[in-house]
Amino acid sequence: MGFDPENQSISSVGQVVGDSSSGGITAEKEPLLKENHSPENYSVLAAIPPFLFPALGALLFGYEIGATSCAIMSLKSPTLSGISWYDLSSVDVGIITSGSLYGALIGSIVAFSVADIIGRRKELILAAFLYLVGAIVTVVAPVFSILIIGRVTYGMGIGLTMHAAPMYIAETAPSQIRGRMISLKEFSTVLGMVGGYGIGSLWITVISGWRYMYATILPFPVIMGTGMCWLPASPRWLLLRALQGQGNGENLQQAAIRSLCRLRGSVIADSAAEQVNEILAELSLVGEDKEATFGELFRGKCLKALTIAGGLVLFQQITGQPSVLYYAPSILQTAGFSAAADATRISILLGLLKLVMTGVSVIVIDRVGRRPLLLCGVSGMVISLFLLGSYYMFYKNVPAVAVAALLLYVGCYQLSFGPIGWLMISEIFPLKLRGRGISLAVLVNFGANALVTFAFSPLKELLGAGILFCAFGVICVVSLFFIYYIVPETKGLTLEEIEAKCL
């Protein structure tokens, strides 16, 4: 018989006491939500795989961004495309470029329905399969329509990955390095982007080079899927299933203990059961023992979490990030880079800067905290956006202003919104609504990205680049107030403590 949430109580120190005769869950009496909990023990070697294989999915996302910019140039070449339908219209190019984005939106919608049923691990296995199928279809595509099917399929893998990867990492990483691990996922995305630009530049002068660009990554989804098959399910997801009666409680608890031992290494062999009992008690205390309804997303602590997560990923996009990167080559050209100075090389330069600044964020995030990095980074973005606006309105004969503003923007974004947006959405939602909540946040992210990308050109023609960048600067100022008054500090807290203290 499964664990019965009705047949439990909270003891005087806040512990779950189940009826063992019903095959339920019992927990030892331990202090709950301690003010100063001791750091979680873990083995460094054991902590690497639960990060590495989900992060491969993020790397594949970044690679797609970099490689596609090169693939478009290859596809449009009469001599190098190797196809008869190379004469692509601007609409065709837009469909190819945004095909993965539409797929990601579909993947986010699918994740909303199935994430809490199949779990984070199986979702990442499915994402790896979609990556592989999408890449293969793209590589062999004989006609335009098949190419788009491949792009959309690959994009569905992106949507599932960007939903499940931060969740799996957040739920399996020790609290003292959780921020660093999830920020490293963003580092993987940027690394993939730089790799995509680099590999794309190698194949761009080869006939049918665009096929080789996508073929290069075929081993990675296989590695990702194999690795996720080997890794255990998230112990918190297993305990959520137990608390909500979605299986035999005792068996699920034992599976969670085994999972935790594998994720943290032999150093916690003697304390794994105790840690699982503490997590169970904390989950029960904050109301995770009742199955969530859709309406709960928009009430109480869940609404607050949705406001924080949705606001961060919305500001992540509407503060101009897609537009600034889109406009980067022309900005650098005004500073003396020739038009033939290869957009690829320019993109690699920016990608390396993004990589360095994301690395800085990874190093300091669990020491400094989320809020200080957000406030400092976004303040730098405000300055850079107003500088860009001023350049286009008043200082067009001083290209150094544009270059400095561009580099400042990219660096500050990667120090703040870039990694911390994904980190916060992975840790702020209550466990029982984490799957659905993150899927909505991912949907907002990709939707806002699409909106800003598509609206940029007409708005630039209507308002002018100077006014548009200043408008982004004003939105950035609004985001500073949002961060200061709404976004909590989660540094060093367990996921259960975040739910109890920050929501």
From Swiss-Prot:
It is a multi-pass membrane protein. PROSITE patterns: MFS, SUGAR_TRANSPORT_1. Residues 8-23 have a biased composition (Low complexity). It is found in: Membrane. SUPFAM superfamilies: MFS general substrate transporter. The chain crosses the membrane at residues 51-73, 95-115, 129-149, 152-172, 190-210, 213-233, 305-325, 346-366, 374-394, 405-425, 437-457, 467-487. GO terms for biological process: D-glucose transmembrane transport; fructose transmembrane transport; positive regulation of flower development; response to nematode; seed germination. Residues 1-23 are annotated as: Disordered. One of its GO terms (molecular function) is fructose transmembrane transporter activity. Its main location: membrane. The keyword Ribosomal protein does not apply. Gene3D superfamilies: MFS general substrate transporter like domains. PANTHER family: D-XYLOSE-PROTON SYMPORTER-LIKE 1 (PTHR48023:SF1), D-XYLOSE-PROTON SYMPORTER-LIKE 2 (PTHR48023). Belongs to the major facilitator superfamily. Sugar transporter (TC 2.A.1.1) family. This is D-xylose-proton symporter-like 1.
